[in-house]
């Protein structure tokens, strides 16, 4: 979960961010 938070916080790839968000949901 911490990794996901860091990835989302960085916002390096908007596409990946959306995918991660979908997985988290």
UniProtKB/Swiss-Prot annotation:
**By what means is the activity of this protein regulated?**
In contrast with PFK1 this enzyme is not affected by phosphoenolpyruvate.
> Which amino acids does the record list as binding ATP?
11
Q: Does the keyword Protease apply?
A: no
Per its UniProt record, the required cofactor names are:
Mg(2+)
Q: Which reaction does it catalyse?
A: beta-D-fructose 6-phosphate + ATP = beta-D-fructose 1,6-bisphosphate + ADP + H(+)
Q: Which domain of life is it from?
A: Bacteria
Q: Name one GO cellular component term.
A: cytoplasm
Q: Which UniProt keywords apply?
A: Allosteric enzyme, ATP-binding, Cytoplasm, Glycolysis, Kinase, Magnesium, Metal-binding, Nucleotide-binding, Transferase
Q: Under which pathway is this protein filed?
A: Carbohydrate degradation; glycolysis; D-glyceraldehyde 3-phosphate and glycerone phosphate from D-glucose: step 3/4
GO MF entries = 6-phosphofructokinase activity; ATP binding; metal ion binding
Q: What is its EC number?
A: 2.7.1.11
- Which cellular compartments is it found in? Cytoplasm
Alphabetized InterPro entries for the sequence? Phosphofructokinase_dom, PKF_sf
What is this protein's function? Catalyzes the phosphorylation of D-fructose 6-phosphate to fructose 1,6-bisphosphate by ATP, the first committing step of glycolysis.
Q: Member of which family?
A: Belongs to the phosphofructokinase type A (PFKA) family. ATP-dependent PFK group I subfamily. Prokaryotic clade 'B1' sub-subfamily.
What is the protein's quaternary organization? Homotetramer.
The name on file for this protein is: ATP-dependent 6-phosphofructokinase 2
- Chain's gene name: pfkA2
């Amino acid at each position: 979960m911490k990794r996901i938070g860091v990835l989302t916080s960085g916002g390096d790839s908007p596409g990946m961010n959306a995918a991660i968000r979908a997985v988290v949901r």
